Every structure is written in C-alpha cells, then in structure tokens.
Amino acid sequence: LCIMLGANKNKTDLLKIYHDLPQKINVEEPKINKDLRLINALIQVESNGNDSCIGDRHLIIPSVGCLQIRPIMVREVNRILAILGDNTQYKNKDRYSHEKSIEMFLIWKNFHHKDHSNEVIARSWNGGPKGPLRKRTIHYWYKVQKELSKNSKDSLGI
C-alpha cells in the first residue's frame, strides 16, 4: 500500500484519516476497507500517486493533486460540510495534500454515493453527477477496475 499510494502511507495512516473526519463519516470497518481499495485505485489512475500532479493543463483551471481535484469540487465539499453543520472549510491549496484530498473525496462520496457501487462512484468522480451515463467514463472505469484487480486484499493487508 505504501508504494501504491506514492507516499509513506499505510493502512493505519489512512484509517486515522477516516477517524479524524467529522462524525458524519461514520462507517463500519468493512466499508472502510472497501473505500480504501477504491481510493488507492483512483489515486493510481488519476496521478500514479503523485501529490504534486497537475492535470488538464489545457483548461483554464487545472485539476491537481493525487486525486486530480478541481476547485469546483472543493466548493462542493465545503457546501456539503455547511449542510451538515460543520465549520470546516477546505482551500484550493488543500488539493496538494494527500490526506486532505482523501478527506474531501470521502466527504463527497459519503454524501452523494454512500451506498453506490464502485463503478458509479468512479464514473461520477471522473465525469461529474452524470458520469455514470456518459460513455466517455467507461474507459476510466476499466482503468479503475484494472487497478482494483491488481490490489487484492492480500496486497493491501486488509
């Protein structure tokens, strides 16, 4: 897991991120393990574990960080936190933080996709709210599936 995440992260570090989040991200251990596998796969597809990765340079505002987060996602996460009564506010520079990127992903995922499949979550992450309906996200999902199959439970220590 440490190598795959591109930093000295292990399962304990990632579980700490989970438990340090606000109480609204209250998830059972088996669900956390599933989320961690998906997060790892998304990080590999999005940035190959590079927290400084800058993508979509052809756009006015690029996506950045290990999960290739755009400013609109930072705003969405802050909106979710406000709805949930949490005063935490993320900044665009937080996209470069491995931990904060994962936190933002989990807040978004647990608000919009709490009980959805990995496919719906991944395709929405890539293509927005209508991602699962867009043909262009199918190839992205195949790449995520490939990473998920590489990262068996044994290799993650789960």
What are these regions (language model features)?
Residues 1-6:
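Hydrophobic membrane-insertion alpha-helices, especially the h-region
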